[in-house]
């Protein structure tokens, strides 16, 4: 059984759509059923990552990212992807809690 991919989006809404398109275009599939099962949560309510990195008195985006990762896992995602450079600043914290 193939794993389901969960994408935490909205931390660059266009990046979310672009990675979705890249996955579809680069998947070697001859029919729809051979594509990667993907769940996209385009959550634009996630606070600005750069603002928090530069000033940690700003709202922390990590709890939002954790919530979305847990939600995607509950929906069946076995792998989580975040198409956002600055979100990767929180990778270790996210990895430890999800």
Question: Where are the language model's segments positioned?
Answer:
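N-terminal glycine-rich anion-binding loop in soluble enzyme alpha/beta folds
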Residues: 2-63
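Short glycine-rich anion-binding loops that position phosphate/pyrophosphate groups of nucleotides
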Residues: 12-13, 85-87
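Short, well-ordered coil/turn segments that N-cap beta-strands
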Residues: 36, 77-78, 98
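Short beta-strand segments at enzyme active-site cores
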Residues: 40-41, 78-84
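Short secondary-structure boundary/capping elements
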Residues: 60-64, 82, 86
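Non-catalytic positions within long, well-ordered alpha-helices that form the structural scaffold/packing
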Residues: 66, 70-76
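Short Gly/Thr/Asp-enriched flexible loops that form oxyanion-binding sites at enzyme active sites
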Residues: 86-98
């Amino acid at each position: 059984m193939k794993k389901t991919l969960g994408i935490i989006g909205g931390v660059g809404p266009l990046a979310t759509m672009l990675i979705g398109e890249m996955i579809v275009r680069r998947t070697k599939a001859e029919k729809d059923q051979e594509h990667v099962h993907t769940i996209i949560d385009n959550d634009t309510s996630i606070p600005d990552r750069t603002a928090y990195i530069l000033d940690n008195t700003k709202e922390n985006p990590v709890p939002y990212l954790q919530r979305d990762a847990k939600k995607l896992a509950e929906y069946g995602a076995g792998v989580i992807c975040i198409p956002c450079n600055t979100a990767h600043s929180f990778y270790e914290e996210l990895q430890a809690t999800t």
